[in-house]
Amino acid sequence: MAAPILKDVVAYVEVWSSNGTENYSKTFTTQLVEMGAKVSKTFNKQVTHVIFKDGYQSTWDKAQKRGVKLVSVLWVEKCRTAGAHIDESLFPAANTNEHLPSLIKKKRKCMQPKDFNFKTPENDKRFQKKFEKMAKELQRQKTNLDDDVPILLFESNGSLIYTPTIEINSSHHSAMEKRLQEMKEKRENLSPTSSQMIQQSHDNPSNSLCEAPLNISRDTLCSDECFAGGLHSSFDDLCGNSGCGNQERKLEGSINDIKSDVCISSLVLKANNIHSSPSFTHLDKSSPQKFLSNLSKEEINLQRNIAGKIVTPDQKQAAGVSQETFEEKYRLSPTLSSTKGHLLIHSRPRSSSVKRKRVSHGSHSPPKEKCKRKRSIRRSIMPRLQLCRSEGRLQHVAGPALEALSCGESSYDDYFSPDNLKERNSENLPPESQLPSSPAQFSCRSLSKKERTSIFEMSDFSCVGKKTRTVDITNFTAKTISSPQKTGNGEGRATSSCVTSAPEEALRCCGQAGKEDACPEGNGFSYTIEDPALPKGHDDDLTPLEGSLEEMKEAVDLKSTQNKGTTSKISNSSEGEAQSEHEPCFIVDCNMETSTEEKENLPGGYSGSVKNRPTRHDVLDDSCDGFKDLIKPHEELKKSGRGKKPTRTLVMTSMPSEKQNVVIQVVDKLKGFSIAPDVCETTTHVLSGKPLRTLNVLLGIARGCWVLSYDWVLWSLELGHWISEEPFELSHHFPAAPLCRSECHLSAGPYRGTLFADQPVMFVSPASSPPVAKLCELVHLCGGRVSQVPRQASIVIGPYSGKKKATVKYLSEKWVLDSITQHKVCASENYLLSQ
């Protein structure tokens, strides 16, 4: 640490870039602290110095009003280099906005990331106030105990008991004291997350009231008042869990719109009841049947009636308009979908659906929405995977019930709680790992308007207006499920135009953007979804979907097609029809030549010419036009870039890291340069923190670069643009620098010095220091000639262990370095090496 030369200084630093987007205060704060000054985070009465540059006008006015010394960043640097307290009047701060009208408010938005500091009562005032307020409230409650009012409590078995107030208050205060003590020790946040609240409810026996079954009759559930009251008192008032209360109030609002659905209310209450029960994960086989006892007979018949009808595209388009409004109105999508009795449950946990944006499933969705739909469809398979693992077999009626229960349980949990860890891990599984999940089966008999709306809410509308392959649910079920369901001859078959099985549902989204995407690596197969040229007669054919890996390998492997660049021949896995009739050809015949670099930068491995024409998202044809349109925006972005990269480079040498950080920030702000580690052909400026003769300085001299001090950067930062270099050139320490720079400026072509042009051929020893390559480069840049073998040279530079000749001069490396520094050939007699 430097000497405390500024020990009496209390500084307030406000250093911004001229456009107000970059804050450079931290670097100068560090330098001031190293010199012994105190740096205040706020402008208080103890501040004696304000380091100011492009700061707030209010700071400037306050400093002038109080008579505080306003200095520039140059004062800090001068004090550091001189090692003494420099007079502040030599470096006054400048306020460029002083003469601007006061009505103009300059907005400042720092684009630099903030440092994360863990909040404690010591470093956070709001946290400290909250902590003190909580302690005062505890003290007030201790002094104002009312011992006269008894308390009535409900035990977990439903019995009513009498408890004196003293016991309740004492236990309550002891819990608060314990909580405060833990907070003091751990310094944790005062507001626990909902996952912490859930853990407390399991550990604390006083919260066991949540586990009490809500024995409310079915008739009572029909009224909204009883539903809201029972739900509120059980979860919000008794438990004191504000998180649960918020969820119930949301549910209460949604139930007001569906008064006629008795089963929905019962399902909600049962899901809430099971939510607090720790034994839910160990459900026996009889629980789904008991759960379904509340379903009406019509809805159970609706589950069992699996008809062969399909929902037409017109119905999908009509429902696509009202689908997003329906989801917005009824937030209870997991429960609603389960009460309708359909086996195509497209549900997610409530906590997950809140954090992930809903996407509309219309066929006119832009590409961004299609990418979101791809992720959401894969996530929707998760409940079915958990169901298959827990039960081990598929039950015809109990499937929706179990899924509804699992969704009901997780809909009130915190998304980041440990209970949902398994769920979130399962979302990342590739599609083929989810094949054992139960296939989505559906009934499409004549439905009412409300039932159709419920189905449309859960359906995928991405394939409206497209002809897709059909799936034999029976064959697929027989291969993936150990105990398949019993279906009739005509009932087991259904087209997948509306809803497909779980694996295909995850894979169908690959074709949404008008092209095929290869499946994850290692699968060895890919699905072909869209058939734009499929003949009309294939609409009614039911093609079995074979799930074996060997048959899937017959489909196109798109990744190998892209890498090899050969024509892909895709065969239909069931009918063996030719590619030219059904599938778009991905390999294009392009007349325009493209370089290897352009091909590598094209998206997805495609290459081709680019034409001016609109991008098409609906169909692919056999020409390369579709891919040209996809490639075009990427190439335009590549050509335009985010501003062209500067052609000249700047090199730093003999500079500590803190100075380097300042230089990098200033260069990034003022533009015009790019930072290079070593001097090269494009280098024009060499910044030297100390006047030391380094290789970069010598190379900069030999190439005719500016050799400047660090102050040039500081003054440029002060004035907001790159200023003239001449006052900051280190010509006193390196007299050759301005001479070589002038020669370089006057030279017509590429500059090459003439210092060693009259010298004989030289040989640089491999044992020389600096390294051979750098020393040879220096000699070559100064006009010298370097030989690779010593017998052709008349001058040998560096230590030489071979046989020495009398006619050859053996000189030290310093001869080359001193000659370049002084810009004259030094006398060789002073640099001879001992024979």
Curated annotation (Swiss-Prot):
Annotated ranges, domain BRCT: 1-93, 640-730, 751-833
Main location, first listed in the record: cytoplasm
GO cellular component, one term: centrosome
Protein name in the entry: Microcephalin
Annotated Gene3D superfamilies: BRCT domain
UniProt keyword annotation of Phosphoprotein present: yes
Pfam families reported in the protein's UniProt record: Microcephalin, PTCB-BRCT
Biased segments, Basic residues type: 343-361
Residues the record lists as Phosphothreonine modifications: 335
Subunit architecture: Interacts with CDC27 and maybe other components of the APC/C complex. Interacts with histone variant H2AX under DNA damage conditions.
Purpose: Implicated in chromosome condensation and DNA damage induced cellular responses. May play a role in neurogenesis and regulation of the size of the cerebral cortex.
Keywords: Cytoplasm, Cytoskeleton, Phosphoprotein, Repeat
Modified residues (Phosphoserine): 279, 287, 296, 333, 548
Comp. bias intervals (Polar residues): 559-577
Gene Ontology terms: biological process: cerebral cortex development; mitotic cell cycle
Phosphoprotein as UniProt keyword: yes
The organism of origin for this protein: Pan troglodytes (Chimpanzee)
Subcellular location(s) per record: Cytoplasm, Cytoskeleton, Microtubule organizing center, Centrosome
Disordered: annotated segments: 332-376, 417-442, 555-583
Top-level taxonomic group: Eukaryota
